[in-house]
Swiss-Prot record:
Its EC number is 5.3.1.24. It holds the Pfam family PRAI. It comes from Pyrobaculum aerophilum (strain ATCC 51768 / DSM 7523 / JCM 9630 / CIP 104966 / NBRC 100827 / IM2). The keyword Isomerase applies. One of its GO terms (molecular function) is phosphoribosylanthranilate isomerase activity. Belongs to the TrpF family. This is N-(5'-phosphoribosyl)anthranilate isomerase.
Length: 208
């Protein structure tokens, strides 16, 4: 069964609706994102999540600070979109937080090799995502070539992201990854989730 993470949740009412529907729910604390929430807003969002596993997502906050914010708000996972050092994993463990490192796809990168290296870390999962600045589109509107996703999907606890929508999710589900990660693909507007799209996504990956 493919797990599902819905990311970029900014409204408590969406967190309530998604709780127990998505396996993971992501809260972005990142000034560069249109779906960013302030750290002080995390507690109310986190408290709305009882059945799903909450995740703090960031890229530019220093790893130690991100882990501290997560621990303070009882968020067990930090998905980190920049470089992590061994000491960061060690520190996260002392705070009861697990890191989810990210392999960012750019044309020409040895994606499989990068994912294999990240899988050697004490990870919650390894996310494969596209460069946020990239405008490239591949099969079904995906931001990463399907052939490359097929190479990394069976390697371990690998989550796939990058342009996934209810319309193309079946392409990803056929690869049987550990998880798919979707934000804008199930939205009415940035940060506002559309439950009809969420249900369509779940149906596309065989969860409904």
């Amino acid at each position: 069964m493919v797990l599902v993470k819905i990311c970029g949740v900014v409204r408590v009412e969406d967190a309530v609706l998604l709780d127990g529907v998505a396996d993971y729910i992501g809260f972005i604390v990142e000034p560069t994102s249109p779906r960013s929430v302030k750290p002080e807003a995390l507690r109310s969002l986190r408290d709305a999540v009882i059945k799903s596993r909450p995740v703090l997502v960031t890229a530019t906050i220093p790893p130690k600070e991100a882990v501290d914010i997560a621990a303070k708000n009882e968020i067990p996972v930090v998905q980190y979109h920049s470089t992590l050092a061994p000491k960061d994993f060690d520190y996260a463990e002392t705070r009861g937080v697990t890191l989810a490192p990210v392999a960012v796809y750019k044309p020409g990168i040895e994606l499989k090799q990068l994912v294999e290296e990240l899988l050697k870390t004490p990870h919650e999962y390894v996310l494969v995502d596209a460069d946020k600045k990239s405008q490239e589109r591949y099969e079904g509107g995906l931001k990463i070539p399907l052939t490359l996703l097929a190479e990394v999907a069976p390697l371990g606890r690998v989550a796939l992201a990058g342009g996934i929508t209810p319309e193309n999710a079946q392409l990803i589900a056929r690869l049987n990854p550990y998880m798919i990660d979707v934000a804008s693909g199930v939205e009415a507007s940035p940060g506002v989730k559309d439950m009809n799209k969420v249900k369509a996504l779940l149906k596309a990956v065989g969860r409904l």
